[in-house]
């Protein structure tokens, strides 16, 4: 869990993904379209992939990826991020991290 918390604080917006996950890609594109350059951690390329997945689940992710952190705090997965975007509450959160 310490590794995940450390990784989630490396940048203002951090996304844990898997390279083969289309939902992860969609979330990445959304943030890039908003003008944010998120830190991407492709956990399937990390030797500790299983431990990272378990830690993300313990933090409250219903699915391990994509897991989005803004300002070091877990926002959620695709559903939460898209809901925030549609309700116009995502942009104020990422405003400090715009490129």
UniProtKB/Swiss-Prot annotation:
Record key words, sorted: 2Fe-2S, Cytoplasm, Iron, Iron-sulfur, Metal-binding, Redox-active center
User: Quick one: a GO cellular component term?
Assistant: cytoplasm
Disulfide-bonded cysteines:
none
Gene Ontology MF terms? 2 iron, 2 sulfur cluster binding; metal ion binding
Subcellular location, record wording: Cytoplasm
Q: Which residue intervals define the domain Glutaredoxin in the entry? A: 1-99
The GO biological-process annotations, alphabetized, read as: cellular response to nitrogen starvation
CDD domains, from UniProt? GRX_GRXh_1_2_like (cd03419)
Record-linked PROSITE patterns: GLUTAREDOXIN_2
Coiled-coil ranges (or none): none
Positions with a binding annotation for [2Fe-2S] cluster: 21
The UniProt entry's sequence similarity note says: Belongs to the glutaredoxin family. CC-type subfamily.
Which purpose does this protein serve, as stated in its record?
May only reduce GSH-thiol disulfides, but not protein disulfides.
Protein name in the entry: Monothiol glutaredoxin-S11
Q: What species is given as this protein's source?
A: Arabidopsis thaliana
- Please state the gene responsible for encoding this protein: GRXS11
């Amino acid at each position: 869990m310490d590794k995940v918390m450390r990784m989630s604080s490396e940048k203002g917006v951090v996304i844990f993904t898997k390279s083969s996950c289309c939902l992860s890609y969609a979330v990445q594109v959304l943030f890039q379209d908003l003008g944010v350059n998120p830190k991407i951690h492709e956990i399937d390329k990390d030797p500790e992939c299983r431990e990272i997945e378990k830690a993300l689940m313990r933090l409250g992710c219903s699915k391990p990826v994509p897991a989005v952190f803004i300002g070091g705090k877990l926002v959620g997965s695709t559903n939460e991020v898209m809901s925030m975007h549609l309700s116009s509450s995502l942009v104020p959160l990422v405003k400090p991290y715009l490129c």
